């Protein structure tokens, strides 16, 4: 599979032999940057954290909503990395304006899902602290379109599992195009991962098929562009 040549700085990191497009950059940040970012995450005020089943998170930049996001200024420790990633051109002419910080303890995960239409169809993720496996799945409705025999449609996550990507600490992952829009993604709640040939980016990583990796606490910075932003003046009823 050939690179699209839209992102010359990323072309050499394209994960091959999978639907377009995933770019995996190991050691995107240094260990000292990782330590700095983790300090900033855990120094955030307690009200910034939201506890969900299987993870907890922080929203930075605003709360995305179907009617529009009331944009908030990003802190400088995040702005540096949103600027860096935006400069790669992955959001077109736009700059990232939203960061979701997730914390996953070993044994935690998130069910297969799609990010939905509130976001520009590209997601970028910096991983901190520990590895994980990001799994991709064929949606049931896509399988229904591709087979004429309803009985053959896979019904379980295991049957619909298409591929996985190993996300190592300090790595950057960019997912866009068909892989972003046509497939579900999730993280299986496990305490360890045995790497199989289904892990599509082993050739881009330091790990090997058959390795078993123990999960620790992982923090992810999910950096995106939210196109629909509300102006504060409109929210306050001004500018009529």
UniProtKB/Swiss-Prot annotation:
Cofactor(s) listed in the protein's UniProt record: Fe(2+)
Binding site for Fe cation: 113, 115, 185
Bound cofactor: record note: Binds 1 Fe(2+) ion per subunit.
Residues that bind 2-oxoglutarate: 102, 104, 218, 220
Enzyme nomenclature, EC number: 1.14.11.-
Any Pfam family matching the protein: 2OG-FeII_Oxy_2
PROSITE patterns for this protein: FE2OG_OXY
GO cellular component, one term: nucleus
Subcellular localization, as worded in the UniProt entry: Cytoplasm; Nucleus
Domain of life of the organism encoding this protein: Eukaryota
Segments traversing the membrane: none
GO molecular function, one term: metal ion binding
UniProt keyword list: Cytoplasm, Dioxygenase, Iron, Metal-binding, Nucleus, Oxidoreductase
Domain Fe2OG dioxygenase: start-end pairs: 95-227
Enzyme's top EC category: oxidoreductase
Similarity-based family: Belongs to the alkB family.
Protein purpose: Probable Fe(2+)/2-oxoglutarate-dependent dioxygenase involved in oxidative demethylation of nucleic acids. Binds nucleic acids with a preference for ssDNA or ssRNA to other types of DNAs. May play a role in nucleic acid damage repair.
Protein name as it appears in the record: Probable RNA/DNA demethylase ALKBH6
Provenance organism: Xenopus laevis
